[in-house]
């Protein structure tokens, strides 16, 4: 196994240009493929997840042209993929697997969808159940309620659709993006509390950019009017990834700063932008512009405080919340992260993985179905700890912050290629001994 040794660094300061948002990139790719016309996409995230989506769209007959390293031309299929039979391998990309499952179920074709072993452990039953309510014919090829899947041609009849909201917002997002293809009105009724609501807001905003409207009644009912067609907006610039911003902003809060991220700011449509609220609650100094954010340690404040522990509801920032778990090691007191049940079904069981690795560093950790409670050690963090990353990009990036307190070894550092291939180069560029 490969590893990366990060030496102790005393200071974090500098500027980072963020890669494109993963959530926006894969939504925009899919909507561009479904639209009438050609869409030019700038600042598309270059990563394993977006690569899986691009490969799938090409196999489905979508014309994709790369003009340079930062622009793609996607010629849409006007709502119908020309290829009616395909075997798609989607790795561990939930932002590709879930929406494509929904869209392909309405394509009157025969498709196989599979991924890496971990993808086959991530539940998809709630989405399949919802699609079956409109007539989709989907078969589980191995285990009930989990990928891989086989999708068969079917007659689709939109109706009221009931879907559980407590597992993954990607199920609802996938349904929303797919239903306009049916051409008839449809209503989605959410059962229970919808988690990760900002991601659904993001989906609706991107759909509107392509000319399709969704009516929302609170977070319980979503109406997709009939006779709507996706139209290319012409050009799209993908804003920077707010989840990726969290590591650099946390570094500034822990180790002096200022650290500035460019590409995302006050005007962002991403829910993870609210990570800065947690940092401010911990005492960090935050400045924001329309498309940039800057963080510094509490020492920049007149009261001279250090970072302090927080009790924080993370429902709106499920990915960036992981960064709070490692930041908590540099705060005074016990930090509690709540409403993180979705961590269990991500790239790994993140509650278990995070608890295990934090304990290696000397932290006291208490965990439950939907919370994590972290108390940093009284003594210094255990030096030269070997951190396992579980093939989870966010585990690797979160634990890079440990180098701001002690040397650390990160196993399998290349797992960051899922969303941020050059993360460690950018991280080391803003950290100084």
Swiss-Prot record:
GO molecular function: 3-phosphoshikimate 1-carboxyvinyltransferase activity
One GO CC term on file: cytoplasm
Key words, A-Z: Amino-acid biosynthesis, Aromatic amino acid biosynthesis, Cytoplasm, Transferase
UniProt key word Cell membrane: no
Residues holding phosphoenolpyruvate: 22, 94, 122, 170, 350, 394, 418
Annotated active site: 319 (proton acceptor)
Pathway this chain belongs to: Metabolic intermediate biosynthesis; chorismate biosynthesis; chorismate from D-erythrose 4-phosphate and phosphoenolpyruvate: step 6/7
Cellular location(s): Cytoplasm
Residues binding 3-phosphoshikimate: 22-23, 27, 168-170, 196, 319, 346
EC number, as in UniProt: 2.5.1.19
Biological process terms in GO annotation: amino acid biosynthetic process; aromatic amino acid family biosynthetic process; chorismate biosynthetic process
Swiss-Prot/TrEMBL catalytic activity: 3-phosphoshikimate + phosphoenolpyruvate = 5-O-(1-carboxyvinyl)-3-phosphoshikimate + phosphate
Protein family per UniProt: Belongs to the EPSP synthase family.
Record's function text: Catalyzes the transfer of the enolpyruvyl moiety of phosphoenolpyruvate (PEP) to the 5-hydroxyl of shikimate-3-phosphate (S3P) to produce enolpyruvyl shikimate-3-phosphate and inorganic phosphate.
Subunit composition and interactions: Monomer.
Protein name: 3-phosphoshikimate 1-carboxyvinyltransferase
Organism: Nitrosomonas eutropha (strain DSM 101675 / C91 / Nm57)
Lineage: Bacteria, Pseudomonadati, Pseudomonadota, Betaproteobacteria, Nitrosomonadales
Gene: aroA
